[in-house]
Every structure is written in structure tokens, then in C-alpha cells.
Curated annotation (Swiss-Prot):
Organism: Listeria innocua serovar 6a (strain ATCC BAA-680 / CLIP 11262)
GO MF annotation: an example: hydroxymethylbilane synthase activity
Cofactor remark from the record: Binds 1 dipyrromethane group covalently.
Quaternary structure annotation from Swiss-Prot or TrEMBL: Monomer.
Identification of the protein by name: Porphobilinogen deaminase
NCBIfam families for the chain: hemC
Encoding gene (name): hemC
GO CC terms: cytoplasm
Lineage, top ranks: Bacteria, Bacillati, Bacillota, Bacilli, Bacillales
InterPro entries in alphabetical order: HemC, Porphobilin_deaminase_cofac_BS, Porphobilin_deaminase_N, Porphobilinogen_deaminase_C, Porphobilinogen_deaminase_C_sf
Cross-referenced Pfam families: Porphobil_deam (PF01379), Porphobil_deamC (PF03900)
């Protein structure tokens, strides 16, 4: 095993926090190894004036990092799983998926303290078509406006740009220590109201398939239950050929030997939401079955229409 491992990470505070957390976990098992983070700027980081759904494409936050991995500039990379395309670059694999943080979305309110207290016509900040579609299904009176930037920037914009509320991933707030901030008015959004993104709350540690020593090292922090649930979600995403320009959601839970998976596809304004769920022993099988059911209900038409806009 090499004495020094180079870890690829995006430059954002959240990405660096996540990478340092992974290094800390690996250090517990491999105290003799030194780790160094190499910061990499991605296309998604550079484009801040356009919503990601309009940029389109896949891998907006991972392509440059994957290239560095393929070029052997880095030894492994730490990603937010929800940013990782369902098909990886040739020669690369997910070496480990650590235990998942909360998969939920979270309201951060400006003045009120609960969703029910938001007035008619409230302005909600999110650039996620998935969040917008599900929220508008529940409250079509809401005005959804895009908001970009890191967590700190979005929290500043909540007040500076007079949003009534913004929606963030609870996992990001947790990792950055914001859940302990008593000045924030937070409310979890249940999966019944807003089904999470595929892989939300989980990390993906990507490495070269041929680098067996790195693969073995990463396996020491893999969390089996999280890996099984994420497998169902990603099989579903791959079958639908989903990306950030489509309101797609998928969330799996494991109880005993069985996995429960629910998937969703909708149009941009939430007027059409297709949902299906399955329980079974094989995560890949139920993820595929739910995707097939949604396709048979017309999900392919919704996806084609959104891609042609």
C-alpha cells in the first residue's frame, strides 16, 4: 500500500468537509497512511448563473474529478451520491458507500416556522425540479424560484432575496453543523410530501477498478445496508435514464431481508406525478420493476417532453 493517498474533491466547503470525514474514517483503520486532498473545480461549480436543469447533461459535479481519477492524478474521489450519474466512466467503480446521513429534504423558513403557516403565494427557493414538482403538487399556489450557491450562500439569500422559505438537503446541513444553529427555523419534509433524490444523504467513494489495494481499503468503511438501498435507487435511475433536468425521485429502505423502494417521475409543475413502489429481496429487481411500471404509465413521454423543452 502506498504511504500517501491523493483524494479528489470538489472545492466547496461541503465537499471538503465530506472528504475530510472519509479520511478520518479511513485513518481509524489505516493510521500509517497519509492522505492529501486535491481540490478540483467542476463544470457545475463554474456555472452559477443558470439552473442545472437548463445546463442539462450528466455528471456536472463529477466529470472532471472522474477524469483526474482515470488519469491517475488522484487515487480515489469523494462525491455526494446524488451527483453521480447512473453509469460510471469506464474503468471506475464505487469502492465504498459509507453509512447514509438523513435522506430527507428540509425547509428553512424566513419568518414562519412550519409549512402550514406559509401564506398563499409564498415564494420558495429551490433549483431542484424534483423538489419543485412535488411541492407544487401539494401547494400549487406557491411561487418557486431558482436559487444556486453553496449552503452558506443560499442561507444568506433566504433573507437578502426575500424568500419565504428555501429547501435544502438535511444531510448537507448536518455535515456543516447547521442543525445545531438555533437561529434557523427548520422543518423536515417527509418522504410522503417530497420523495428524496436517488442517493440523497449518501456518499460515493469512487476508485479505479484495477487498483485493488485502494478498493480493499475503501471496503473497510462500506455500509452494507446503505449500499443495498442505494443499489435499488440507482438501478431505477439508470432504467429511466434520469438526470437533473427531470423531476425523478427514488428512495429505498431495508427491513430485515426485504427492501422497500418507491419511485416517482413528474412534470415540472407537479400537475402530473407518477408513483410506484415495491418490496422484495433483490434491490436491483425492485428498482427495475418500479421503473418498468412508471414507464408503462407514461413516464417515458414525460421524460421526452422535458428533454425537448
Amino acid at each position: 500500500m502506498k504511504r500517501k493517498i491523493i483524494v479528489g474533491s470538489r472545492r466547496s466547503k461541503l465537499a471538503l468537509t465530506q472528504s475530510n470525514w472519509v479520511i478520518k474514517k479511513l485513518k481509524e483503520n489505516y493510521p500509517e497512511i497519509d492522505f492529501e486532498i486535491k481540490e478540483i473545480v467542476t463544470k457545475g461549480d463554474r456555472i452559477l448563473d443558470v439552473t442545472l436543469s437548463k445546463v442539462g447533461g450528466k455528471g456536472l459535479f463529477v466529470s472532471e474529478v472522474e477524469q483526474a481519477l482515470s488519469d491517475e492524478v488522484i487515487d480515489f474521489a469523494v462525491h455526494s451520491m446524488k451527483d453521480v450519474p447512473s453509469s460510471l466512466k469506464d474503468g471506475l467503480v464505487i469502492g465504498a458507500i459509507p453509512k447514509r446521513e438523513s435522506p430527507l429534504d428540509c425547509f428553512v423558513f424566513n419568518e414562519v416556522s412550519t409549512l402550514d403557516d406559509l401564506p398563499k403565494g409564498a415564494v420558495i427557493g429551490t433549483s431542484s425540479l424534483r423538489r419543485a414538482a412535488q411541492l407544487l403538487k401539494h401547494r400549487p399556489d406557491f411561487v418557486v424560484k431558482p436559487i444556486r450557491g453553496n449552503i452558506d450562500t443560499r442561507l444568506q439569500k433566504l433573507h437578502a432575496e426575500n424568500f419565504d422559505a428555501i429547501i435544502l438537503a438535511k444531510a448537507g446541513l448536518a455535515r456543516m453543523g447547521w442543525l445545531e444553529n438555533t437561529s434557523l427555523k427548520l422543518e423536515d419534509i417527509s418522504p410522503e410530501l417530497c420523495l428524496p433524490a436517488v442517493g440523497q444523504g449518501a456518499l460515493a467513494i469512487e476508485c479505479r477498478e484495477t487498483d485493488l489495494q485502494i478498493c480493499d481499503m475503501l471496503a473497510s468503511i462500506h455500509h452494507e445496508e446503505t449500499g443495498i438501498c442505494v443499489e435499488a435507487e440507482r438501478v431505477f435511475l439508470k432504467k429511466l435514464n434520469g438526470g437533473c433536468e427531470i423531476p425523478i425521485a427514488g428512495f429505498a429502505t431495508k427491513t430485515g431481508d426485504s427492501v422497500h423502494f418507491k419511485g416517482l417521475v413528474g412534470n415540472a409543475d407537479g400537475s402530473i406525478i407518477l408513483e410506484s413502489e415495491r418490496t422484495g429481496a433483490s434491490p436491483a429487481e425492485i428498482g427495475n420493476q418500479v421503473a418498468e411500471e412508471l414507464l408503462s404509465e407514461g413516464a417515458d413521454t414525460i421524460i421526452k417532453e422535458l428533454r425537448n423543452i
